[in-house]
Amino acid sequence: FNPCPYSDDTVKMIILTRENKKHDFYTLDTIKKHNEFKKSTIKHQVVFITHGFTSSADTENFLAMAKALSDKGNYLVILIDWRVAACTEEMSGIQLAYYSYAASNTRLVGNYIATVTKMLVQKYNVPMANIRLIGHSLGAHTSGFAGKKVQELGLGKYSEIIGLDPAGPSFKSNDCSERICKTDAHYVQIIHTSNHLGTLVTLGTVDFMNNGYNQPGCGLPLIGETCSHTRAVKYFTECIKHECCLIGVPQSKKPQPVSKCTRNECVCVGLNAKTYPKTGSFYVPVESKAPYCNNKGKII
């Protein structure tokens, strides 16, 4: 009995660029019908976005992130929709009981992303340095598994994987080979926003602890857990739109205010985090309302 079975046929992709914002779904077979995939070379930087448990690629938060990316840097954004294997189509009352099935599908979805990556590299001449993955919750571990698989296939490493509140249950006590891990890409950026659905275990090159684990504006701990878990997606979207929106202070320097930050000791959450010299764990104060920024206009 597997209520949320995985098969390549049930995974779909939405492909967005600045010129083409249609939310059409493609498969490995039909992807060649998309204008970008009719070309012999894809010159865009490519970003994969992968959702988590009981979610889908066409939810408002992920489409907003994709739009921010294509507006900002004319990225080619591939949203991976694995809703069947993520138990999204099951009845809401019993979905939670099926979590372990979705969790065990993450490696298979990761392998799928690696297959698409191989096609991008070998058929469309996209260098691995031009590809990053962003994943939320179970999608963060999926992205990690994709990072392991492309190395296994001899393609090298992705430039970056960004894990947005990686799922804690079934993963937080796993060793590196069974979860997202800092060796899965050249740079692995983790944004932690919850303690039960997510985890406060450090997993990446940099780990940002946003306000600890209970996000402002999300209500009481536990009751606001889903809101806190989802905030990671919203925070990162704002960090794409606003440079240095969220600045991380080294955990060892907490409670040093963000205003005292320099480029050599603090790190800005976002697409440019990897250009900062410091690695490790960072504390990130956040505001309770969008755009959540803590930098008061400061850029380091």
UniProtKB/Swiss-Prot annotation:
* Cystine crosslinks: C4-C87, C176-C181, C218-C227, C244-C268, C245-C293, C261-C266
Any single GO molecular-function term of the entry would be:
phospholipase A1 activity
UniProt KW keywords: Cytolysis, Disulfide bond, Hemolysis, Hydrolase, Secreted
Identify the Pfam families for this entry: Lipase
Cellular localisation: Secreted
Give a yes or no for keyword Calcium in this entry: no
What domain of life does the native source organism fall in?
A: Eukaryota
What family does the database annotate?
A: Belongs to the AB hydrolase superfamily. Lipase family.
> What is the name of the protein in this document?
Phospholipase A1
